[in-house]
Amino acid sequence: TCSGSITNDSYTLHCFSNAVHGGVDLERSLAKSCNSSFANIGLSLNLRDFSETCEELLFNRDLPIDFAGSGSRFSLSADSGKSEVMATAIGQGKTLVSPLHMALIVCAIQNDGVLMRPYLADRVENSDGGRVEQYEPSVYGRLMTEKEAKILRRYMKTVVEDGTASALKSDSYVAAGKTGSAEY
């Protein structure tokens, strides 16, 4: 149950605007960006499994790109204190992620868990419009199961329909997303 903040080992983490979310499941936690809920989840996780999952999502690895881009870092270990775990569970702490990396994860979610290799140009044409080179889409690999991707898509739609991104809600289109902060 979210009371607007969580304290553990003298470290207090607040929900945005000190919002009190009450009893929330994972979907509502994501929709409302409930820091208390994610801190509790982080404290309950096996840190090794948490780290492995992040590495499956390409943290601490080179991104599958053929152009300049920065990688992302996830750092938790058995020695990590509770405050570091809590901060990391809300995407803060020592975690660094580039916008490109987040876009790749979202693309995999939308593509049933499969990540395609990103490229900057579809084709190269000469001055007459003739095709000089055509680049073909290629699969990088699976970042998550189809079922996990489907659940995440539903959760991200809830963020727009009844969560922190509700300003994007429209009868003209369907949108999904996740809000976030660069620092807490």
Give the location of each predicted region.
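Beta-lactam-recognizing serine transpeptidase/beta-lactamase-like catalytic domain environment
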Residues: 1-184
